[in-house]
């Protein structure tokens, strides 16, 4: 089963989520604040982090920012759960790379479970990772068979010579 790190400072709410997710069979770790969350994320390497936004010490937004810039855990899936329902807060989470942003007052416990399953079933984006296995030419070098579209000094696009001399 997937490993889930549950980060929630409200103990009673954390206990409710923990019990429900445990019933689903997830391998759970918990943290009560942002500092604990970061330490646990690096140690446990969860498949998913459920992250409260408003926490003591480090906010969920700051935790997410640190996660996305820490190579060992940068591609970990993250669901943010918060009482903050403003569009600006949701946009902030999305800009930081959250996989799903849920407003606690707008979802049931079962909605949370459904969203966890959806996020875990979504392939991790690798758009920012380099393509391995294909050597890339140095800047300004035109590979054999390609057309040079770099502008010449006069602004016209370059073209390969008709009869190249070697």
Regions found by a protein language model. Give the residues of each.
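Helix N-cap/capping motif at the beta->alpha junctions
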Residues: 30-39, 60
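Active-site beta3 strand of CheY-like receiver
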Residues: 44-50
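Short amphipathic alpha-helix used as the core "switch/output" element in two-component signaling
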Residues: 39, 61-74
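Receiver (REC) domain active-site loop signature in two-component systems and cognate sites
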Residues: 55
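Alpha4 helix (beta4-alpha4-beta5 surface) of REC/receiver domains from two-component response regulators
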Residues: 62, 85-102, 106-114, 118
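Conserved acidic carboxylate
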Residues: 8
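Active-site residues of response regulator receiver
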Residues: 52, 82
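Two-component/phosphorelay signaling modules centered on CheY-like receiver
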Residues: 11-29
């Amino acid at each position: 089963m997937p490993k889930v790190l549950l980060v929630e400072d409200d103990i009673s709410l954390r206990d409710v989520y923990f019990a429900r997710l445990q019933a689903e069979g997830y391998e759970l770790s918990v943290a009560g604040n942002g500092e604990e969350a970061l330490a646990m994320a690096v140690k446990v390497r969860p498949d998913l982090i459920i992250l409260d936004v408003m926490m003591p010490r480090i906010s969920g937004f700051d935790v997410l920012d640190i996660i996305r810039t820490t190579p060992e855990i940068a591609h970990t899936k993250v669901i943010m759960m918060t009482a903050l329902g403003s569009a600006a807060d949701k946009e902030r989470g999305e800009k930081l790379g959250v996989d799903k942003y849920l407003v606690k007052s707008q979802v049931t416990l079962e909605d949370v479970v459904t969203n966890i399953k959806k996020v875990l079933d979504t392939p991790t984006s690798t758009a920012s990772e380099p393509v391995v296995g294909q050597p890339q030419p140095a800047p300004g070098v035109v590979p054999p068979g390609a057309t040079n579209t770099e502008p010449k000094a006069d602004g016209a696009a370059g073209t390969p010579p008709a009869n190249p001399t070697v």
